[in-house]
From Swiss-Prot:
This is Undecaprenyl-diphosphatase 2. It is found in: Cell membrane. Its main location: membrane. InterPro entries: UppP. Belongs to the UppP family. It comes from Bacillus thuringiensis (strain Al Hakam). HAMAP family: Undec_diphosphatase (MF_01006). Keywords: Antibiotic resistance, Cell membrane, Cell shape, Cell wall biogenesis/degradation, Hydrolase, Membrane, Peptidoglycan synthesis, Transmembrane, Transmembrane helix. Catalyzes the dephosphorylation of undecaprenyl diphosphate (UPP). Confers resistance to bacitracin. The keyword Hydrolase applies. Bacitracin is thought to be involved in the inhibition of peptidoglycan synthesis by sequestering undecaprenyl diphosphate, thereby reducing the pool of lipid carrier available. Its EC number is 3.6.1.27. The chain crosses the membrane at residues 5-25, 42-62, 89-109, 117-137, 192-212, 220-240, 250-270.
Amino acid sequence: MEQFYYILKYLILGLFQGLTEPIPISSSGHLVLAQHLLGLKIEGFSFELLVNSASLLAVLLIYRNDLIRLTKNGLSYIFTRAEDAKSDFFFIIYLVIATIPAGVIGVLFKDYIDQYLKGVKMVGISLLITAVGLWIIRNLRGRKNDGDLSMKDAIIVGLAQACALIPGISRSGATIVAAMLLGMKQETALRFSFLLYIPVSLGGLLLSITDIAKDPNLDTLFVPYIVAFIATFIMTYISLKWFMNIMAKGNLKYFSFYCIIVGVLTLIFL
């Protein structure tokens, strides 16, 4: 019976993670709220690593063609200086640059963030900040394509991503808001945001991989962890495909409304 409880618990958290990871409402913030509201305390170090791995796998699957093209053209430009591969080569460079702020800040301030910025009230405030950003860009229509990006764009989007280390600040929301304020087209902003998720997530996995071996609950929670992984992967795939359609229709304001409602309710009642 206890094992069934754990399976159900991690199934719920996995579905929750998968649903909220791609869309701009902060998956980390919602996990904090879900644990608080449902009284679900996560045992062990490996859960966040596990569900992030599942979300990463779903993103890799969806953007596989972009990744293949970027890799092919990036190598082509390095070895042949092919002019038609130049924009993809620099797109990769800008992704690397944009990864740096979150990586540096995450390493230096992880303990501080975990101790002081993961409270329920902080999540409420951060969701309201996310809502404001999404509202500001609701009608923006930029002109920048992949080939029009600059180092300045990469640095600013990278700094925006670093802000999302705070639960309640959506990673996809922060990066898309920054990208669109810099004049990127919606599809360019979306692609840059989720391709940027890949190196950041991989870096986090590499830094945390030893947590699995140290997890004292791994034997007990092996099956629930697998259930959470599968649930997160499937839900992330579905949620990201849905979000891509929402972006294409320019309906980001609905996510802003949602973040306002949840943020206000969190501050009042939790």
